[in-house]
């Protein structure tokens, strides 16, 4: 019976991280599930669901050489896993405004209170050092009518934070 784990690896971005990690997993007959891998700042981060007939300590030992040679940190959590458990998002929220403390907390808090569930969030700071602009894109799902979600972020718009909520067309298949 396979055990499911969430692996989180992070280290300074360099060539070959994904190849080395996935090769080590392949050599131990570990099944890869969903994954998110991206560069943030100068670092590369991997979050990956895996299934294996190994305990967490053996899985950690299987990755030890790669972790050490690539200068990575590794965190392993046991989880209830499975493949093909996708939720199809129905809304996208785009946010921009002068970079200031609390934008993420305020927008996501208002959306959550209105019944919006975040599936993916990406953010960046654009503009210049003198005039930074915070940009955020949120993909999620909600059964709350669009008008109610719009009302939930109305105060932020009045403060100069641009928040656009629109239906998301998702092609499946």
Task: Tell me what each language-model feature is.
Residues 1-173:
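A conserved regulatory-domain signal marking ACT and ACT-like small-molecule sensing domains
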């Amino acid at each position: 019976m396979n055990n499911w784990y969430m692996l989180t690896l992070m280290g300074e971005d360099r060539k070959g991280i994904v190849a080395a990690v996935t090769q080590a997993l392949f050599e131990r007959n570990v099944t890869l599930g969903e994954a998110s891998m991206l560069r943030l700042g100068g670092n590369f981060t991997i979050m990956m669901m895996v299934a294996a007939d190994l305990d967490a300590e053996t899985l950690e030992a299987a990755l030890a050489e790669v972790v050490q040679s690539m200068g990575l940190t590794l965190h392993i959590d046991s989880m209830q896993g499975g493949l093909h458990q996708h939720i199809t998002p129905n809304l996208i929220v785009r946010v921009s405004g002068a970079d200031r403390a609390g934008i993420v907390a305020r927008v996501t808090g208002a959306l959550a209170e209105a019944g919006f569930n975040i599936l993916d969030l990406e953010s960046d700071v654009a503009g210049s050092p003198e005039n930074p602009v915070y940009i955020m894109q949120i993909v999620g799902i909600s059964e709350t009518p669009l008008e109610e979600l719009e009302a939930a972020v109305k105060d932020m718009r009045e403060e100069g934070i641009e928040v656009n909520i629109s239906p998301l067309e998702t092609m499946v298949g």
